[in-house]
Amino acid sequence: MVNAEDLFINLAKSLLGDDVIDVLRVLLEKGTEMTDEEIANQLNIKVNDVRKKLNLLEEQGFVSYRKTRDKDSGWFIYYWKPNIDQINEILLNRKRLILDKLKSRLEYEKNNTFFICPQDNSRYSFEEAFENEFKCLKCGSQLTYYDTEKIKSFLEQKIRQIEEEIDKETKLGANKSH
């Protein structure tokens, strides 16, 4: 069975790539707040590289920080911690982003007419096809009308599915907080 930390790391890896995982692992293993300098020392990498990774992780909600001012130098010190308890919210936000992209794509499919090359399946909008005299740019074949009903139907089904998931997960989250 996959534990929460593995799931958290795999999610970060799928959204941000392998580069940030070393920093996330150190924070998870430590279990308490760490400064960027402590992380850099433990990983033996530059503090600036750690900061870049922390900022990427923070943008997606994987880590958060609190800052204090050093009394001697006047510089800010950032204390970072993993937000493993926010994994459901991170997933929910990702689904919302995907939903927005699917809705945009559906609008694009609904608002445009398409043509396709029967030889290589290159797809062209009406404007592109018109500019090229309804000939394929790659092979010169005559383009044919492309019916997007299957694509629109698929997109609509995926949109409904994700909306239902978001709705269900939002209700579950609201019930947990009571």
From Swiss-Prot:
One of its GO terms (molecular function) is DNA binding. InterPro entries: TF_E_archaea, TFE, TFIIE/TFIIEa_HTH, TFIIE_asu, TFIIEa/SarR/Rpc3_HTH_dom, WH-like_DNA-bd_sf, WH_DNA-bd_sf. Pfam families: TFIIE_alpha (PF02002). Coiled coil: none annotated. PROSITE patterns: HTH_TFE_IIE. It comes from the Archaea. Keywords: DNA-binding, Transcription, Transcription regulation. Transcription factor that plays a role in the activation of archaeal genes transcribed by RNA polymerase. Facilitates transcription initiation by enhancing TATA-box recognition by TATA-box-binding protein (Tbp), and transcription factor B (Tfb) and RNA polymerase recruitment. Not absolutely required for transcription in vitro, but particularly important in cases where Tbp or Tfb function is not optimal. It dynamically alters the nucleic acid-binding properties of RNA polymerases by stabilizing the initiation complex and destabilizing elongation complexes. Monomer. Interaction with RNA polymerase subunits RpoF and RpoE is necessary for Tfe stimulatory transcription activity. Able to interact with Tbp and RNA polymerase in the absence of DNA promoter. Interacts both with the preinitiation and elongation complexes. HAMAP family: TFE_arch. The winged helix domain is involved in binding to DNA in the preinitiation complex. This is Transcription factor E. The lineage of its organism: Archaea, Thermoproteota, Thermoprotei, Sulfolobales, Sulfolobaceae.
